[in-house]
From Swiss-Prot:
This is Vacuolar-sorting receptor 7. A motif (Tyrosine-based internalization motif) lies at residues 605-608. The tyrosine-based internalization signal may be involved in trafficking at the TGN. GO terms for cellular component: Golgi membrane. The gene is VSR7. It comes from Arabidopsis thaliana (Mouse-ear cress). Disulfide bonds join 418-436, 425-445, 447-463, 471-491, 478-499, 501-512, 542-555. The chain crosses the membrane at residues 565-585. Residues 1-26 form the signal peptide. GO terms for biological process: protein transport. It is found in: Golgi apparatus membrane. It comes from the Eukaryota. Glycans are attached at residues 292, 400, 432. InterPro entries: cEGF, EGF-like_Ca-bd_dom, EGF_Ca-bd_CS, PA_dom_sf, PA_domain, VSR_TRX.
């Protein structure tokens, strides 16, 4: 009965997917890398290759190796039983024919034979397609998770050229380049993971959950630092209208058949139902939304890992109560999350899940999301196994040059190209300044900013400081020298650039030499003048006991100078005496004038003795009428 139910479930899903395919035109985008033929010269060319969806592509890096085509077992469908070694000390890139077995099995046999990468040549003329890993089967068990080398599909004509060149004995050297496989427009990477809360879907589900647990630490560091913007997504289907009231639809869907997921155990009679998965997927979406609103989007990683360990299907704990206990333990507002989830029984659209269905459809350069798990970085689908370090490298490849966080420049992820020959960039070994900037995809030769001073130049052969404080940095690249306690410099803070020899020196500013003014007879030309050159200047003197006047370029007598000083002193003394006499005279006259004025004023109010004697008659005089 379980088998019958499983087939019924599969039939239902196929019908639903068929309806969806009729509604929207599905689009699958092939993610590519660059392949360059470096040697021999007559074969030099550039081609595209399709990145396989297994193994570990070297995102942000490149690989240079020699092409080897096997004498037998050219399809790689069985073990080679030997190790391929090129004639030259380079990594082996094994060329294999398409057909006969899984692509991943070819890569596995190539890896066992010592290959660093594998090229699979198409056997028909057609556009490139993506080599995917096989579904769960006995053939796939044991090697899919062990594949570490990158695999690339190339078109038939390019494969024919490589095959013929190798058979003619040519040493074919190619470069596999993944540095531009991930768009890197700015300093923030936006990535999304299409996943599922179901942990009973076999190897695919285990791979997803293992990745989430292992990548959690990296993801939260990047998110907390503001370097990335992560968004989780969940695939949902809808039930065809004619099946809405069927038992299958009711057990696998919510909101009256609008959002569905397959039965976890493929058994409609017992265990968990598809709608349980849809509801938990919705809850995890709402956890991210609510956490993002509180500026803690990284809490989603905590919730998903905690839910898997505490509420797994395998332990029969996959329930709403268990989920809400995890939410409470993470101090998330449970009422907001419930409001976000809404009523799963209502005959209405759920905007969160509706958005997910729309997002499944490809936009721009991104193809439709059709398989789980799918990782999208800067709107480009990641190819390869979901492995912590490999995914981190792909995310790091999405940063613009020089904007990568420190976690991306770890020696375990990339090679610091500035350590060898300074990356071919300009450097000032004396000041320990370099134009080489290590980046995840390589290096940049770019003049630096040191202590607030901007250097300008091409970054390869020259960099010179620019701006007001440029002279503090190695004297602005200009000439400078010190002798006998004197320092002269060709750098001036009053100008933003350039070098100019100071007065007393001549040259281009990078080198300056003392000018011998005495030899050039440009100074000390007066009669009786003597010139003595010095570093950065000169000294003029006069013969005898005369003094040299620099402004007039002349010599004067010292005694004449003393007479002038005595004459000046005498004149000043006379002026001082005259001033003193005037002051004394002025003071005397002013006092006499004041005495007279005071007496006049007082006489008006009280008669003075002399005036009284005239006005009072004498006693001897007779009185007359």
């Amino acid at each position: 009965m379980g088998l019958v139910n499983g087939r019924a479930s599969l039939t239902f899903l196929l019908a639903a997917l068929t309806i969806i395919a009729m509604v929207v035109e599905a689009r699958f985008v092939v993610e590519k890398e660059s392949i360059s033929v470096l040697n021999p010269e007559e074969m030099r060319s550039k081609h595209d290759g399709s990145i396989a969806n297994f193994g570990l592509p070297d995102y942000g890096g490149f690989l240079i190796g020699s092409v080897v085509y096997p004498d037998s077992k050219t399809d790689g469908c069985s073990a080679f039983g030997k190790t391929f070694k090129p004639k030259f000390p380079r990594p082996t890139i094994l060329l294999l024919d398409r057909g006969g077995c899984y692509f991943a099995l070819k890569a596995w046999h190539a890896q066992q034979a010592g290959a660093a990468a594998v090229l699979v040549a198409d056997n028909v003329d057609e556009p490139l397609l993506t080599m995917d890993s096989p579904e769960e089967s006995k053939d796939a068990d044991g090697f899919i998770e062990k594949l570490t080398i990158p695999s690339v599909l190339i078109d038939k004509s390019f494969g024919d050229d490589l095959r013929q060149g190798f058979q003619k004995g040519k040493n074919i050297v190619i470069k596999l380049d993944w540095r531009e496989s991930v768009p890197h427009p700015d300093k923030r990477v936006e990535y999304e993971l299409w996943t599922n809360s179901n942990d009973e879907c076999g190897a695919r589900c285990d791979e997803q959950m293992d990745f989430v647990k292992n990548f959690k630490g990296h993801a939260q560091i990047l998110e907390k630092g503001g370097y990335t913007a992560f968004t989780p997504h969940y695939i949902t289907w809808f039930c065809p209208f004619q099946f809405i009231n069927s038992p299958h639809c009711k057990s696998q869907c919510i909101n009256h058949g609008r959002y569905c997921a397959p039965d976890p155990e493929d058994n409609f009679r017992e265990g968990y139902e598809g709608k349980d998965v849809v509801l938990e997927n919705l809850r995890q979406l709402c956890v991210h939304r609510v956490a993002n609103e509180s500026s803690r989007p990284w809490v989603w990683w905590d919730y998903v890992t905690d839910f898997h360990s505490r509420c797994s299907m395998k332990e029969k704990k996959y329930s709403i109560d268990c989920a809400e206990s995890v939410i409470k333990s993470l101090n998330l507002p449970i009422e907001k999350i419930k409001k976000c989830i809404g009523d799963p029984e209502a005959d209405t659209e759920n905007q969160v899940l509706r958005t997910e269905q729309v997002s499944q459809i490809g936009r721009g350069n991104r193809g439709d999301v059709t398989i789980l798990p799918t990782l999208v970085i800067n709107n480009a689908q990641y190819r390869g196994r979901l492995e912590r370090t490999a995914v981190l490298k792909a995310i790091c490849a999405g940063f613009n040059e020089t904007s990568e966080p420190a976690i991306c420049l770890n020696t375990g992820l990339e090679t610091n190209e500035c350590l060898e020959n300074n990356g071919g960039c300009w450097q000032d070994t004396k000041a320990n300044i370099t134009a080489c900037q290590d980046t995840f995809r390589g290096r940049l030769c770019e003049c630096p900013v040191v202590k607030g001073v901007q250097y300008k130049g091409d970054g390869y052969t020259s960099c010179t400081p620019y701006g007001p404080a440029r002279c503090t940095m190695n004297n602005g690249g200009c000439w400078s020298d010190t002798r006998n306690g004197l320092t002269f410099s060709a750098c001036s803070d009053s100008v933003s650039t350039g070098c100019k020899c100071p007065e007393g020196f001549q040259g281009d500013g990078l080198t300056c030499e003392d000018i011998n003014e005495c030899k050039e007879r440009s100074v000390c030309q007066c009669s009786g003048c003597r010139c003595k050159n010095s570093w950065g200047g000169y000294k003029c003197s006069c013969s005898g006991d005369r003094l040299y006047i620099n402004d007039q370029d002349t010599c004067i007598e010292r005694y004449g100078s003393k007479t002038a000083w005595w004459l000046t002193f005498l004149i000043l003394a006379i002026v001082a005496v005259a001033g003193l006499a005037g002051y004394i005279f002025y003071k005397y006259r002013f006092r006499s004038y004041m005495d007279s004025e005071i007496m006049t004023i007082m006489s008006q109010y009280m008669p003075l003795e002399s005036q009284r004697a005239r006005e009072v008659p004498s006693e001897a005089e007779p009185f007359t009428l």
